[in-house]
Amino acid sequence: MANDAIDDVTVFFYNPNIHPRREYEIRKEENKCYCKKLGIRFIDCDYDVENWYARTKGMEFDPERGKRCTVCFDMRMERAALYAHEHGYQAIATTNATSRWKDVQQVNESGQRAASSYDDLCYWAYDWQTDEMTMRKYQISANERFYKQEYCGCSFSLRDSNDWRRANDIPKIQIGGDSAGLGERYFTDPLVDATEESQEVVDEFFAQANKLAKVGADKKQRKAALETYKERRKNEAHDGSFNGLNNW
């Protein structure tokens, strides 16, 4: 598939996970504008947020890349696959597979499950996370001055990302506006942006996030875990150890 000509592309925007609504509208509008620039069809699906919360109930404190994320991927890929089948498309793919913040196997398995429901449809699995592809992604983002999203999208990701930031003495996430919680509001420097998605930064974030997930909803235990982590990070910074950033 990667070597075949692709002459009919449609962007199907179905992301009921994105919270709050303002962040959702910002991301959607940017997609619409870029599609218009490239002459690509854009399908604006419903903001089905009530259904998303219903399907993820009981998973509020699951870690990133956990069961909640699988449910989230499945929900969106199922809807994309249905649209593709009903409108004669041969394949589906997802930008989620381009991010090192995502477990590519988890993403691909979701896409494959969704596509397997239809005999005339396949899921396009490709290695989008190479250094070359990551740099290309950030070159495009900088050229277009895309809005820099500071977390994955859902309210639980927003909560956990802000917890991680507090533990690292990083300002909390800002929704919209011309100022980000950290760094630039828009992509401007491919080298800096790619560094923020280095494997080292990603691994560090998930190591801490998984520990918080084990604590769950207990506020006292979460606070204690964050304080322990924060003290360790201060010691590492004093020793000259790497202190990463958070750029989704």
Across the structure, where does each feature detected by a protein language model lie?
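Nucleotide-activated chemistry modules centered on ATP-dependent adenylation/adenylyltransferase
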Residues: M1-W248
